[in-house]
């Protein structure tokens, strides 16, 4: 890609956007349990007479809200810095759908994996090593859907909806698995 080659920038902008989202979410997910572990509150949470699934729901919801707030800032900045000179398609607002579906999946899977990496020495690296392969199908589908929405080429919107359906199916399966496995992750 050369400077001024507007089509080239738009063609890989979906991948750049999701790389930005993944790395910022990994930073936030690494810190999601830091307050509880540093002050010893995690033991108090575990002693409370509530189901561990409720703890997962609360942590996943707080991680989701954090990620949505980060995206509220970073996505407009991404458009300003990377796509300000590019011609965007009229379908560009459709990127909100893969952003929402992808963020839900990142928060759900990331909550489970960050819980598993709480007490490890290199938890920052371990979370990235665990997260990226596990979340690859979700990221692939979201990058595909985001790229289609940004380019807006006629006849490719079937790919958008297929990718979005794949991401939503991933969310359902992986969040259900995380919900069921969270008690074991907390106990270890």
Regions found by a protein language model. Give the residues of each.
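Transmembrane helix boundary and interhelical loop/hinge segments in multi-pass membrane proteins
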Residues: 26-46, 60
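Long, hydrophobic alpha-helical segments
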Residues: 13-29
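Selective transmembrane-helix segments that form parts of the transport pathway or gating/packing helices
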Residues: 50-79
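Membrane-interfacial helix-loop-helix connectors in multipass membrane proteins
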Residues: 3-12, 75-98, 146-164
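Transmembrane helix segments
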Residues: 113-162, 166, 170-172, 176
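A structural motif at transmembrane helix-loop-helix junctions in multipass membrane proteins
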Residues: 87-88, 97-132, 184-188
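Junction motif at the cytosolic side of a transmembrane helix
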Residues: 171-188
